[in-house]
């Protein structure tokens, strides 16, 4: 028996089960079946991972509609795990709404089936159809509460932006088929890997892929819908932030050889993704709503993931994708408990580190990172190590935080542990997806380094000098996201207007006095 076909059949079984599960909710929502399908998908992906490790399944065979690869297996296991947790949470969240939970579970299972189809597809047309289907089915979940104006407006904007991303992806797919004469992603990956340069059409296809990823990941200025969809049910937000919005990064990873040979695609990702990373992180510091803060955090994290892809650090992008998905699923599903802890942090007074503490933290973090680079003889882009050094600097300098106070030795030790764990995880991810040398070189490193320095300046001003008169206008601008979404929304509604639900206004409700005082 051909184990390659067995593995492909097992992977194909997972989306089929999700689609069939969406059809079993005519009388009542079958939550147990949905949980069982998600759990079965997780077990099948784990079994296939073991089969690949022991070489029972050959990964080198191309020309199949279903792609069995290490990358697809990791993503498949991740999506099925998120699906299982989401379904279990949703069963309690939607309890008591008999008619609504049937509709909710039906579209949830369809969305999950489409996401899995994108992940396992090795055929570009199948990928395209499933990519479109994700957007359409997710739209039904985003407008689950059709009487909420913000939710309807966000879904409307997302609907338009999704069409833009799909147009870019379709253009890239047609160009790649014209250039390489095949619809299979694995064949294109192999052909481009053997090349040292791209044709003009391939360059254009890489640019379209980069634009599709930027729009899919809600990068500035097409980001507003991601902030406003928090009006949707909480598990929908968790699914969106943990398993759907990061598909832009997945798209770049599966077309990695094409991206690293295109200077224009890399610089588009570096500029837009880098600016989004810094601005979204600073805007997040000014917001008070837990869900809105998480949404801005997702924008920043997606921007950083796209920057990693532009620098050729695809193993780091994969690690980032998996870690972000697990964290955001937990954060959104635990948003209710986060409100209390967030309130405590805001009510407690932060102790500003002294100049000596900042110098000590900076020297210690720099020594850790430089020592590791020297001992392990590491090469490649150094801006990620600069980012890690900044994170450890903040960890050590702000050890006397809002709620807790830790010793210097403890924080330095924690920094060393984080550095070791990060290095081990990065090396582990390189066994699945390897990094590639890009043409941006030191220029890309310099650009990201400049943005990180600007982030530190903004962080210091917003955190420790936000009460100054001259900082209030700056903070107000950050809080509003520099009004970028307002301009985009106006343009959006002018080009493609929509009718929003009418709000219920009790003050204008005319009630006769006889009925009012009965």
From Swiss-Prot:
Annotated keywords: Cell inner membrane, Cell membrane, Membrane, Transmembrane, Transmembrane helix, Transport
Record GO terms (molecular function): NADH dehydrogenase (ubiquinone) activity
Main location: membrane
Induction remark: Induced by growth in low levels of dissolved inorganic carbon (DIC) (at protein level).
Keyword Transmembrane carried by entry: yes
UniProt note on regulation of activity: Intracellular DIC accumulation is sensitive to CCCP (carbonyl cyanide-m-chlorophenylhydrazone) and DCCD (N,N-dicyclohexylcarbodiimide) and therefore likely driven by either proton gradient, ATP, or both.
A Gene Ontology BP annotation from the UniProt entry: ATP synthesis coupled electron transport
TM regions (residue ranges): 3-23, 37-57, 65-85, 114-134, 165-185, 207-227, 242-262, 264-284, 302-322, 358-378, 379-399, 403-423, 442-462
Compartment(s): Cell inner membrane
Disrupted gene: phenotype observed: Cells do not grow in low DIC levels, increased carboxysome content. Decreased ability to accumulate and fix DIC under DIC-limiting conditions.
InterPro entries: ND/Mrp_TM (IPR001750), NU5C-like (IPR003945), Transporter_DabB (IPR046396)
Membrane topology according to the record: Multi-pass membrane protein
Cellular component, GO annotation: plasma membrane
Domain of life: Bacteria
Family named by the database record: Belongs to the inorganic carbon transporter (TC 9.A.2) DabB family.
Oligomeric and partner information: Forms a complex with DabA.
Role description: Part of an energy-coupled inorganic carbon pump involved in transport of dissolved inorganic carbon (DIC) with downstream gene dabA (Tcr_0854); has been suggested to be a proton-DIC symporter.
Name the record gives this protein: Probable inorganic carbon transporter subunit DabB
The species this protein was found in: Hydrogenovibrio crunogenus (strain DSM 25203 / XCL-2)
């Amino acid at each position: 028996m051909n184990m390659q076909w067995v593995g492909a059949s097992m992977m194909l079984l997972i989306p089929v089960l999700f689609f069939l599960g969406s059809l079993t909710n005519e009388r009542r929502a079958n939550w147990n079946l949905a949980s069982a399908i998600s759990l079965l998908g997780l077990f099948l992906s784990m079994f296939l991972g073991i089969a690949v490790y022991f070489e029972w399944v050959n990964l080198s065979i191309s020309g199949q509609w279903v792609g069995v690869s290490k990358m697809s297996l990791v993503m498949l296991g991740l999506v099925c795990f998120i699906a299982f947790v989401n379904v279990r949470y949703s069963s309690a969240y939607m309890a008591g709404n008999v008619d609504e939970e049937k509709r909710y579970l039906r579209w949830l299972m369809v969305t999950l089936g489409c996401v899995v189809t994108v992940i396992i597809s090795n055929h570009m047309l199948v990928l395209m159809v499933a990519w479109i289907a994700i957007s359409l089915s997710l739209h039904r979940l985003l407008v689950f509460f059709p009487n909420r104006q913000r939710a309807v407006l966000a879904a409307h904007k997302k609907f338009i932006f999704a069409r833009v991303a799909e147009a870019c992806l379709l253009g890239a797919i047609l160009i790649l088929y014209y250039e390489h004469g095949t619809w299979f992603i694995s064949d294109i990956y192999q052909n481009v890997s053997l090349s040292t340069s791209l044709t003009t059409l391939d360059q254009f296809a890489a640019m379209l892929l980069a634009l599709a990823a930027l729009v899919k990941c809600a990068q500035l200025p097409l980001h507003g819908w991601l902030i406003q969809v928090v009006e949707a049910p909480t598990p929908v937000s968790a699914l969106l932030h943990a398993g759907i919005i990061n598909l832009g990064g997945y798209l770049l990873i599966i077309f990695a050889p094409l991206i690293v040979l295109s200077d224009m695609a890399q610089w588009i990702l570096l500029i837009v993704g880098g600016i989004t990373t810094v601005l979204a992180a600073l805007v997040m510091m000014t917001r008070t709503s837990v869900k809105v803060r998480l949404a801005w955090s997702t924008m920043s994290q997606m921007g950083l993931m796209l920057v990693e892809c532009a620098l050729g650090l695809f193993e780091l992008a994969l690690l980032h994708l998996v870690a972000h998905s697990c964290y955001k699923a937990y954060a959104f599903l635990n948003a209710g408990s986060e409100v209390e802890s967030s309130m405590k942090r805001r009510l407690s007074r932060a102790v500003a580190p002294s100049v000596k503490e900042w110098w000590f933290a900076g020297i210690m973090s720099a020594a850790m990172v430089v020592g590791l680079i020297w001992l392990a003889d590491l090469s490649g882009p150094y801006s990620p190590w600069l980012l890690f050094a900044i994170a450890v600097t903040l960890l050590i300098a702000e050890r006397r935080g809002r709620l807790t106070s830790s010793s210097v030795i403890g924080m330095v030790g924690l920094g060393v542990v984080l550095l070791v764990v990060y290095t081990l995880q990065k090396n582990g991810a390189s066994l699945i997806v390897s990094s590639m040398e890009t043409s941006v070189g030191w220029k890309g490193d310099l650009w990201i380094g400049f943005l990180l320095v600007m982030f530190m300046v903004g962080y210091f001003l917003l955190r420790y000098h936000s009460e100054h008169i001259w900082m209030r206008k700056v903070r107000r601008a950050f809080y509003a996201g520099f009004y970028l979404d307002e301009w985009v929304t106006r343009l959006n509604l002018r080009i493609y207007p929509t009718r929003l639900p009418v709000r219920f206004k009790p003050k204008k409700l005319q009630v006769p006095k006889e009925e009012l005082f009965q």
